[in-house]
Amino acid sequence: MPFKKLSRRTFLTASSALAFLHTPFARALPARQSVNINDYNPHDWIASFKQAFSEGQTVVVPAGLVCDNINTGIFIPPGKTLHILGSLRGNGRGRFVLQDGSQVTGEDGGSMHNITLDVRGSDCTIKGLTMSGFGPVTQIYIGGKNKRVMRNLIIDNLTVSHANYAILRQGFHNQIIGANITNCKFSDLQGDAIEWNVAINDRDILISDHVIERINCTNGKINWGIGIGLAGSTYDNNYPEDQAVKNFVVANITGSDCRQLIHVENGKHFVIRNIKARNITPDFSKKAGIDNATVAIYGCDNFVIDNIEMINSAGMLIGYGVIKGKYLSIPQNFRVNDIQLDNTHLAYKLRGIQISAGNAVSFVALTNIEMKRASLELHNKPQHFFMRNINVMQESSVGPALSMNFDMRKDVRGVFMAKKETLLSLANVHAVNEKGQSSVDIDRINHHIVNVEKINFRLPELRE
């Protein structure tokens, strides 16, 4: 019952209705469509929310109202909605738990501070909120230790700032089938904007249309401070499906002022496309132990990276799956297309594009790449390697514009070299220094088939 004083008349009327309350008809009365939390006890918001959810389908926090001291867990019943126009505040220990069909929505600046939304059901929606606070590890947590299948998660139109992590998924114990995380702005975070960790059971994940700014871990935490990160479990060069994060798309991301924008470990069957990056440099998250790159891929199979525009930024790292110094896997079967990297006005050297690829049956295709004041470095040997429409310029004082290091025979990583039916195909590939002179370093060519057309350098003599 709403928190209001009862007059003697109201009290007598209520008392006369007590017998009626025990009838089956009374017990079957549906919850009201909407209740206002302002009608409940303001001295105990925890109890008030629990009562409100028992009485209404939607609990509304009206504009101008601040509900503070939300410092414990509150379960939103299945199918019910928390709609926020005012503000909810806690000390970091409070959370709202979403069950099947639960929704938390915001409007007109509706906000949450130091409170976690804990997703534990299917058909959940979180949208329209402003979220902040360094109290909890993350603003939205998706996971838990119970085995369950969660379907059709929607997270949309959030503004998250001045927090640790924004969205954290721990996926080892459960499964998500279908998640759309869209149209959010993440800024001034210590941790990741989105971390999808050990998500080996998930599929059909869309992460798109986000703005990510100023991700800078200064608290000494290791591996914090990435824009968007997805990871499977243990690296394995056979790329088993049940150990990889898979079947996802990351698209339409605008990012700036962070150390690493997009990160994938042990993934397969994915697409990264339409990325615009500015100022992705080592000036951020200096002690977090993460590589500086706009896109960092480790030990992945069967993927596409398409339409990446980078300015004054570290470029791309596509490298081995490594644990404690042991090389466990190498990237294979991928295409990198429509890449622009312009570091013309950058005051210092940063990574250009570094690619390690291999395995006995594998392919790599690099197409439509333009790089200014940056290097393209290729390591190890995939079975079939294609390069088309490549233009690279790097200053001679820094090093060659294009490096091809195929000969790994004396390197422990040589175990990943393709050796049978190998193909190298180059067409319209130009690598120059600032004077327009050829700037290429190639160690050894021993591919079974070599096709070359319109390149501005000579290949080493073929060797057996």
From Swiss-Prot:
Gene3D superfamilies: Single-stranded right-handed beta-helix, Pectin lyase-like (2.160.20.10). InterPro entries: Colanic_acid_synth_WcaM, Pectin_lyas_fold, Pectin_lyase_fold/virulence. Transmembrane segments: none annotated. The keyword Signal applies. One of its GO terms (biological process) is slime layer polysaccharide biosynthetic process. Pathway: Slime biogenesis; slime polysaccharide biosynthesis. Disulfide bonds: none annotated. Keywords: Lipopolysaccharide biosynthesis, Signal. Exported by the Tat system. The position of the signal peptide cleavage has not been experimentally proven. Residues 1-28 form the signal peptide. It comes from the Bacteria. NCBIfam families: PRK10123.1, WcaM. This is Colanic acid biosynthesis protein WcaM. It comes from Escherichia coli (strain K12).
